[in-house]
């Protein structure tokens, strides 16, 4: 076979794959095994999220060539953090993607103090989208991985003052969650409570195409992902765990500064991601509603676990929209190992207290 025949065969094979591919919207309907209004809503919601991901991916691919993509705006957000230009752009993209959809009554983002209401949607929009528009935005300026995280909740109760108090519920109230990873390829991972599924954006088609279904995380993995630069700001239990993995073979450290990127690696390879509280921030840095709870939902669907140290993260009820929480998430055995060091320190503290009394 000459080179032209080989090329022709390769192109023909690619075309065959494209013809038989499963798109994101089709996959949602197939998994719900229904064309009911609710199923069509969920398919449309995921399609809109995919649209936002495509627009953000396109902007990121040209970040060094267009104005308004790199650097800071000079503003401080509700979290007390400097705002990156891509944070603002991505936040506005999600709003624009849903504004004319008729699907959601409001959007809640870590970039906005209060939920963004879409009055024309509220009579019929039955859902709320919660999201982190750009996770790891400090990586944008140096061309490293970043991501978007999303969660969908059913619209419940009333919110007369538009502060989103009815959203202060545990993670079990989510009906869907996922993330988009912007890297060498753009990957969308989602769950609607029926397993975890992976899609890759095919630029030639402009569609997210199914790459893996019913993904499960290994019960144990080699990777531990934590910012060891904060070592002396942690409680003793986390330092004990870190010393343990340093001294025992079979553990390797990977930390990129982007939660989505580190989570994605662990979801595929197994291991544990840790973002603990510190002396300065005892509740940690990650926002429960926009980051931790959506990823916990995914992890449990993949057969893993998510913990705050002594209790399941999915059980935590926030006391305000931007509440933070520590996060220990990953393979069941690796999360249990971290928890064992926390339990040991708790037991030691109780024994010391008993001796003093």
From Swiss-Prot:
Catalytic activity from the UniProt record: beta-D-fructose 1,6-bisphosphate + H2O = beta-D-fructose 6-phosphate + phosphate
Pathway annotation: Carbohydrate biosynthesis; Calvin cycle
Presence of keyword Chaperone: no
Family note: Belongs to the FBPase class 1 family.
Gene Ontology biological process terms in this record: fructose 1,6-bisphosphate metabolic process; fructose 6-phosphate metabolic process; fructose metabolic process; gluconeogenesis; reductive pentose-phosphate cycle; sucrose biosynthetic process
Binding-site positions, Mg(2+) 1: 110, 132, 134
InterPro entries assigned to the protein according to its UniProt record, in alphabetical order: FBPase_C_dom, FBPase_class-1, FBPase_N, FBPtase, Fructose_bisphosphatase_AS
A Pfam family matched in the record: FBPase
Subunit structure: Homotetramer.
Cofactors named for this entry: Mg(2+)
UniProt xrefs under PANTHER family: FRUCTOSE-1,6-BISPHOSPHATASE-RELATED, SEDOHEPTULOSE-1,7-BISPHOSPHATASE, CHLOROPLASTIC
Subcellular location(s) per record: Cytoplasm
Protein residues bound to substrate: 135-138, 227, 255, 285
Binding site for Mg(2+) 2: 132, 135, 291
Annotated Gene Ontology cellular component terms: cytosol
Name of the protein described by the UniProt record: Fructose-1,6-bisphosphatase class 1 1
Keywords annotated in UniProt: Calvin cycle, Carbohydrate metabolism, Cytoplasm, Hydrolase, Magnesium, Metal-binding
A GO molecular-function descriptor: fructose 1,6-bisphosphate 1-phosphatase activity
EC number: 3.1.3.11
CDD domains the record matches: FBPase
Cofactor note: Binds 2 magnesium ions per subunit.
Enzyme class at the top of the EC tree: hydrolase
DNA repair keyword on record: no
């Amino acid at each position: 076979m000459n080179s032209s025949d080989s090329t022709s065969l390769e192109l023909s094979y690619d075309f065959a794959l494209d013809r038989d591919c499963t798109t994101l919207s089709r996959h949602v309907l197939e998994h719900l095994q229904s064309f009911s209004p609710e199923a069509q809503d969920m398919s449309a919601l995921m399609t809109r999220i995919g649209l936002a991901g495509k627009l953000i991916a396109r902007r990121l691919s040209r970040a060094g060539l267009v104005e308004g993509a790199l650097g800071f705006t000079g503003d401080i957000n509700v979290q007390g953090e400097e705002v990156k230009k891509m944070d603002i752009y991505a936040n506005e993209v999600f709003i624009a993607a849903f504004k004319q959809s008729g699907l959601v009554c409001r959007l809640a983002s870590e970039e906005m103090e209060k939920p963004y209401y879409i009055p024309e949607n509220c009579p019929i929009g039955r859902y709320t989208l919660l999201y982190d528009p750009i996770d790891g935005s400090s990586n944008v300026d140096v061309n490293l991985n970043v991501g978007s995280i999303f969660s969908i909740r059913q619209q419940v109760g009333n919110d007369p003052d538009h502060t989103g108090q009815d959203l202060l519920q545990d993670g079990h109230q989510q009906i869907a969650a996922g993330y988009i990873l912007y890297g060498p390829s753009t990957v969308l991972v989602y769950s609607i409570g029926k397993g975890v599924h992976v899609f890759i954006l095919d630029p030639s088609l402009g569609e997210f195409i199914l790459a893996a279904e019913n993904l499960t995380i290994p019960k144990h993995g080699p990777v531990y992902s934590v910012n060891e630069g904060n070592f002396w700001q942690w409680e003793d239990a986390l330092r004990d765990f870190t010393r343990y993995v340093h001294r025992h073979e079979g553990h390797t450290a990977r930390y990129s500064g982007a939660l989505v990127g580190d989570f994605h690696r662990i979801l595929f390879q197994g291991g544990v991601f840790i973002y603990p509280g510190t002396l300065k921030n005892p509740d940690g840095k990650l926002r429960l509603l926009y980051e931790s709870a959506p990823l916990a939902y995914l992890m449990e669907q993949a057969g893993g676990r998510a913990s705050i140290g002594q209790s399941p993260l999915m059980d935590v009820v926030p006391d305000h929209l931007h509440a933070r929480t520590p996060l220990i998430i990953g393979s069941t055995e690796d999360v249990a190992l971290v928890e064992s060091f926390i339990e040991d320190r708790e037991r030691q503290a109780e024994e010391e207290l008993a001796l003093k009394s």
